[in-house]
């Protein structure tokens, strides 16, 4: 069961496997999922919510793969009690999240949202209202040095920030 769109390369791999029958659903509402899981061996899920109520209907289920890094939308305790593994794409988006973090840091330092709004309104004189902070040589503290934090650090060093 593939609940939502995944990258075309991933779908091509699944389609190319002769022993795999792909089941797709148009809706990810609980009733649709409850029916869809009844005869599947595996589930690939992005954001659909798989509660114990839905998963108990999956009598043949052998694995759930989360197409992403978290699994808050899957009742992992229920699956663990049944001996069914849950796979995640650990670290797959760490660089993207790190780049996004860096972008938000720069936007915040430059008060970019307020500046942009003023320009779009034609309020050119407002530029003096917003304080911008120079970040070159700034000291940066990274709270949490997991997959994402480890990617943020070298990006900060590129900007001559002190960690």
Model-assigned labels for residue ranges:
Residues 8, 27-34, 48-52, 73, ...:
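Structural motif corresponding to alpha-helix initiation and N-cap regions
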Residues 129-163:
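Rossmann-like dinucleotide/phosphate-binding beta-alpha-beta segment
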Residues 14, 43, 64, 79, ...:
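Generic structural signal for small/hydrophobic residues in well-ordered secondary structure
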Residues 22-28, 45-46, 119-128:
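Short gly/ser/thr-rich secondary-structure transition/capping motifs
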Residues 41-120:
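Phosphate/diphosphate ligand-binding glycine-rich loop within oxidoreductases
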Residues 36-37, 55-58, 135:
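A short, aliphatic-rich alpha-helical micro-motif
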Residues 1-40, 160:
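N-terminal glycine-/charge-rich "phosphate-binding" loop or analogous flexible N-terminal tail
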Residues 13, 100, 104, 151, ...:
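Rossmann-fold NAD(P)-dependent oxidoreductase module
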